[in-house]
């Protein structure tokens, strides 16, 4: 087999990865000299860990072809050596599909062992994963494929009872209408699919340099999805050196080693479950990843008891569901030493129940796919653990807390969080406008979070400045919903709001003002939900409450303030 040259542009006319904003060389040099950035790629890190732990357990989980039926506890077990074999088979599958090193591959897999096989396989092969969620639908996937020029789309037919083949056909047809080449579909759950012979290590191609970095470790390794505050999720280019620094330090802070067993109940593709310290942190430490087919307490508790899992990352609604269930059932969670809670603010009253009910230490986590990650530490005062979201990973994480005019706020006062550092990006992929608004000229990322800093340095999240709904840790851009309503419905105005909810944090609400002389029918909610599904919107974004009004209320000075209006209507919908 001929290997790809470092200047390969990919198969079937696939374009090379476009340039994206990089950290200035002087700053990058400091990060190297400080030991934050090391000259190691994902391929090198994974092969090193495989060689060091070849006979140790790497992953426990269901297979994709067992998803339509069977028990949620039916599992396979792979050692690190077996994971390598499966990953090399996945790499062979990518090669047979026409993928070449440097090409982008959309990975849209549930929590099955195939997720790890194809993630590791893509990294070993030199393809760049684009981590989509199983919940994403045709509208979002069309955008991901078009913006990345993805060469392949890896799915598990039947996952979450969804027809991913039909989904692919739907958006592929739309791409072809635009003169674009759709990604090749790879269905890992197809029992008739040809099982390729795994590649040998010596057949792995040479890595491709993307964006001209002199060090391969400072090239992009994959594209993660942002939570999104405007439209479809933005693409986040993560480099080997920066991301692996975050993974290594997270694993150290969280005390991972070769005996660690992490239960992954949330979607594996989430940045939280991927790297904080997540799946990659466990693989770095030589531990085992326990994949739960669903996040229910029943499934999770059974796996914790059977596999002796000792760490579990959760979002607040899931943590609260575990607490409520544990109070009723008294499961054996004696192996669990650490429960991480992140993705949204965790109410102190709920946080206080983690240790007495689940029997594990609580660690609050506050981070973002763009970079900055904060953890409470093992030796933190209990009150800080219950009420704050921790301190940054790195001594070189820079944090600014500013008022609306861009001035530093007095210590202890809430303000807008801006940050830059050794693992925070300097810009999105292919998003010139968003880069101008989301990043300052000197490279600080405007997170959209409102925080206050305690004298100890701990950050406490008090709210959001950006227009975004946080539903069970899934971030939903209100502009996407409002634009869709204006485009597809007979309305003159639309406002999407987050409705406070104890179970999921916020539910999706939509307020509509019909055009003059137009009506939305007897059941506007049903009409909206059907229309949004037809547009290919992910189910978690579909409005759960719809209100029709003759006009939108004005502020006391006669103007429409979108920020005040959303707060006013959210309060009304919550009644």
Locations of regions flagged by a protein language model:
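Structural core segment of the AMP-binding/adenylate-forming
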Residues: 2-12, 120, 127-199, 516
